[in-house]
């Protein structure tokens, strides 16, 4: 979920420090629905370790113990579990990985031991599931040692090195040896909205896009309609900044087989025939020409 930082600074009174105090603050807020909470790894790590935690440095044994105590306290106060992020898609406003992204199994299992002391809780993780990280090995070890259920975000994604079938096979293998790992799926496919007035579109990485990116809507559309500018823009090759998110930029600029027109019916299950790539082929055009 993405939101402006001003929504937090203007919409919340920061009148707590501990997790139990946070729950008390939530209790005082008017709301239309019930809410459940998880103790967040990033906040706990930064609180215990300061800049070392925010910078994803390795913790000491005492750091891990302190984090485990805070998480245990949070669960005893009413949290349903603990959550951690291990994906390069989750970054701070400065572009840095959120605290805990690269935490090693010793830290994660140490925190889970604190959860076990509380007597309940679900350990939740969102990960890129890079094969070399051996995520399912430590998830299995954690669950078997602590008895906790461990859940991960199971997605079929063009940017994940491990497909969904492999994810589920590894989960079942660990569970056959006594672990309790569960896969969580999205209620619908997730994606990005691309357009002239959004943060990105298929032409954002072409050099000439800089000429129109900051224009107001009327001037931008007029420039894009200019045949000479359109020809120049289409002739250029996208230039991607060096980043661990480069693959995402390439998908936005070149992944027309996975891009669809957003129509008034908001169809979240379009067919392959409705993709920009297929419509372009039918029209005898390239993907970027059609877009």
Which residues make up each language-model segment?
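A gly/proline- and charged-residue-enriched helix-loop-helix capping module
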Residues: 5-13
């Amino acid at each position: 979920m993405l939101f402006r930082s001003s929504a937090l600074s203007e919409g919340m009174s920061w009148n707590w420090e501990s997790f139990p105090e946070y729950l008390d603050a939530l209790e005082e807020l008017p709301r239309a629905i019930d809410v459940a909470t998880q103790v967040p790894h990033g906040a706990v790590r930064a609180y215990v370790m300061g800049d070392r935690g925010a910078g994803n440095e390795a913790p000491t044994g005492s750091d891990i113990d302190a984090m485990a105590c805070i998480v245990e306290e949070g669960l005893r106060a009413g949290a349903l579990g603990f959550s951690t992020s291990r994906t390069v898609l989750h970054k701070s406003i400065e572009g840095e990985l959120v605290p805990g992204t690269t935490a090693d199994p010793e830290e994660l299992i140490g925190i889970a031991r604190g959860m076990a002391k509380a007597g309940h809780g679900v350990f939740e993780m969102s990960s890129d599931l890079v094969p070399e990280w051996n995520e399912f090995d430590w998830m299995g070890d954690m669950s078997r040692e602590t008895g906790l259920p461990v859940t991960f975000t199971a997605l079929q994604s063009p940017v994940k090195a491990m497909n969904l079938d492999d994810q589920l096979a590894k989960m079942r293998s660990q569970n056959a040896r006594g672990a309790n790992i569960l896969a969580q799926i999205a209620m619908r496919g997730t994606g990005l909205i691309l357009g002239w007035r959004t943060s990105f579109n298929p032409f954002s990485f072409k050099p000439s896009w800089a000429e129109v990116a900051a224009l107001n809507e009327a001037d931008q559309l007029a420039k894009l309609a200019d045949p000479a500018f359109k020809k120049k823009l289409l002739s250029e090759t996208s230039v991607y900044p060096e980043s661990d998110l480069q693959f995402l930029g390439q998908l936005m600029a070149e992944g027309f087989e996975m891009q669809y027109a957003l129509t008034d019916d908001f169809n979240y299950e379009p067919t392959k025939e409705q993709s920009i790539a297929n419509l372009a082929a039918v029209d005898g055009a390239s993907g970027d020409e059609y877009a």
